[in-house]
């Protein structure tokens, strides 16, 4: 690879990393979609250094550059799958109906990003024959400088009992080592019932009973305290283990892909040389070549 080409790729790499770090370190972000679009733009800009010039797979620097870009893109795709559009606290406050007779408890693993929520619906409130409830749960940090995230939507069946477990796959990002207060809200977006619940419906909900009736309501959990990550040795150890396991998986994956490409290149070169050898052998064994060789021998 020419020196000028290497310098151009190095410049694109450094500029892309700088833009990526600036976007990642921004504290006040309106929506997760905007945040992800900025990060993807950074990686597209970073990839110009690869697309602009033709790459030679045999060059180790190019292979390292491609591996780095592949890991970054995979991380971005994973982040896009975990984030959705957030709902602000003011929107929830405008539709809040806080007289729901429910008890909500939340247990969250802030290192793995998973949260499990259990709520007990009072039979006198909801009726005994409510068959299905869909829940959209949202958690946000109570500081405007923190990044927010919308949790996943869970569907559950209450036909077997009143306790309902909801497991979500993402949680707001906690920046810094200080303890933060997180307020979590759960919105009932769909409740189907087959019985008359006109006398058992909480205040603010529809009072008419119809088959497969849809109701909307919201209730608020207590504020939960996020532990200080640096003070939890066990949590730090688990985080370190997860980091090591992810690192090993990435290294093994990149090594496998690299080895596969190397094998393909070796087989292609072997096939190319064998074909050239075969053509040379056929050329030497042609009748006119053999006659000229015999004539030279007779002289």
From Swiss-Prot:
Subcellular location: Host membrane
Topology term for the membrane: Single-pass membrane protein
Residues spanning the membrane: 247-267
Protein name per the record: Protein U23
UniProt main location, coarse: host cell
Key words, A-Z: Host membrane, Membrane, Signal, Transmembrane, Transmembrane helix
Signal peptide: 1-27
Source organism of the structure: Human herpesvirus 6B (strain Z29) (HHV-6 variant B)
Single GO cellular component term: membrane
Name of the gene this protein is made from: U23
Top-level lineage group: Viruses
